[in-house]
Amino acid sequence: CCSTADLTEEHFKARDISYICFHFELNGKEYADDLGKSIPFDQFYAAMAAGADTKTSQVNAEEFEEYFEPFLKAGKDILHITLSSGISGVINSAMIAKENLEERYPDRKILIVDSLGASSGYGLLMDKLADLRDEGKSLDEVFRYAEKHRLNVHHWFFSTDLTFYVKGGRISKTAGAIGGVLNICPLLNMDNQGRLIPRYKIRTKRKVIRTIVDKMAEYA
């Protein structure tokens, strides 16, 4: 999967899940999204809180080829689950790498699934797929399960800081300023195309948490 599943290094190792790193820039310096090894999480979030300029970049096709090829050389087939196509074009890079490698390894199988999810929801899907693998399900069975059940994961989340919604162009500067004054916490989720959709504008953190709990009960 991709590092954007937001599982810990220890969890990836314990579940025997391989991952490829995205990239990000912090104040013009590029880092690998390598789960806090290049820059500790506390330093990263402190820099963001201080107003650092941030930018992300997806994995390119060449990087995917370098990531996939050792498995193929070892005689293994591959099932790779990507970050949602609704927020990233990374699946396109993975598909290009798949096509290139299948020409060189015609006896091997490379299956790619668009998770239509992100962060801990994406990680939850990966955990379930690892369970199926450990139960002895075949690669094709795990692939079909992922395709069929990926939308059973519901993503609901909020932020009390509108700064990065403004920087990302999701809300205007005016709306961000007004929202900050009024203590508005946007509640978002991911739709069936894996896109981030603002659903509610709720005043105060306590009320938005209550709404998320209600959504958990609704979709459980």
Task: List the model feature ranges, each with a label.
Residues 1-63:
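N-terminal glycine-rich anion-binding loop in soluble enzyme alpha/beta folds
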Residues 4-12, 17-23, 79, 86-99, ...:
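Mixed-charge interfacial surface used for oligomerization/domain docking
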Residues 31, 44-45, 64, 68, ...:
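Aromatic side chains
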Residues 49-85, 92, 96, 143:
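Glycine-rich phosphate- or other oxyanion-binding loops that anchor nucleotides, phosphorylated ligands
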